[in-house]
């Protein structure tokens, strides 16, 4: 069953550069596990970044999370000081289609 996650990263002042370095290292790995970065946005003050990420299933998601290459770059995430929250979500677009604005 496909999974979708919302990642919310709260970045302290000066943390964006290290967070970007971490993301540059780990986001390319998504494709190896069938994962997709559907959206990546950041607040204008660089204090919050949000990702919408999809995986074909739980097995692929867990394999991505346990990839040792992610652990190799964990020091960058720690150095960024980011507080990260990962929420499983579901799509409600069909209930309220975009208005076309």
Label the predicted regions.
Residues 1-68, 87-101:
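Short S/T/G/P-rich N-terminal loop/turn motif that feeds into the first structured element of a domain
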Residues 61, 69-80, 84:
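C-terminal structural segments of small proteins and small subunits
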